[in-house]
Amino acid sequence: ASETFTDYCAPLAWQHAGFTSYPLAVSAAQGTLYASMLRESAKRQNPSVYVVEVNGFLYTEAERDELGTAATREWLDTLPLSRNKVQAIDECVQGDRLSYYVPLLKYHDNWRKPDLIRNSLSLQQQARDAGYSYTKPFLSISMFLTETDEIPVRQQSLDDFNEQSLRTFCETAKARGIKNVLFARFPHRTVIENYDAVFAELEAVVHEYGYDFANFDTQMDAIGLDPLNDFANAEHLNIFGAEKFTPYLADYLAQHYDLNTAHSQAVTDEWTRCAAFTQQMLPVCEDNTRRYTCEKLDEFSPVFADCH
């Protein structure tokens, strides 16, 4: 879910608590994608705990219809051809699947958009040159809520489709022998009808599989979040909110799980560079947010070119 981009900054957690973390997210990803994301992650790492933001298991049928195709494309088109990609296409795509194997069928006319291609190639080259993401990756939305902003009321629920997606994810984790998964509701201002019942049901399913649930919506006072100034919108924290929530979540994880904070010199050097880059990035994000520029800033934004 996109909250993983905006609400949590891995280099800040490293500075605060000394552990490494590697967020993986696709904006508006629904729960059907999560099992393949877990399988892909498990190819590359064996973390002490997986943290799963639960919004993807709560989309309504209308929201899934509206957002599902774009999010599915964004995830599946990044995967190299592999057993996981084939399985993910089978799990997530209804109807014609050929273009998911042959992207040229979908994107053959992109030559008409040279600026789009140029920007994409530039971002890919920057990532290759560094060898890793400096912010793992973090996104700042330069906005804040005001008293006149309308807070949406959503009819989200753990309907049959969402429950099956959640169970499939849990079964995938169990089959891989993954012991620690924290399902988390990151802070939101959105109002969900039947809120208590929705999250009680979700928590009950998670506990069936022996996994954990934490609702940070209900801990905003403890986190110190301002309901207006720390939110970019009803769904996402801004930079000020992220700077509060990240250490809070880091402390929660350190208290509840056995996290490794002893690292090789190579890992320490990498994360020290990431933290230094992030510290240069934060004041710019803060200033843009105070000025309500509405910009979305990440490590590849031109304003940070000299920081690399």
Where are these regions (language model features)?
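C-terminal regions of proteins
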Residues: E193-A305
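Membrane-embedded segments
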Residues: S2-Q87
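Active-site segments of SGNH/GDSL-like serine hydrolases
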Residues: C170-Y195
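Alpha-helical scaffolding within the catalytic cores
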Residues: S36-R39, E163-F169, D196-A200
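Acidic-and-aromatic substrate-binding clefts and catalytic sites of carbohydrate-active enzymes
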Residues: A28-T32, S157-N162, R189-D196
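Active-site-proximal beta-strand/loop segments in catalytic clefts of secreted hydrolases
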Residues: S2, L24-S27, E53-N55, A184-H188, ...
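Loop/turn elements at helix/coil->beta-strand transitions in domains of secreted/extracellular proteins
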Residues: G18-T20, Q45-V49, K174-L182, Y209-D212
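Secreted/periplasmic serine-hydrolase-like ester/acetyl group-modifying domain
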Residues: G68-I178, H263-H308
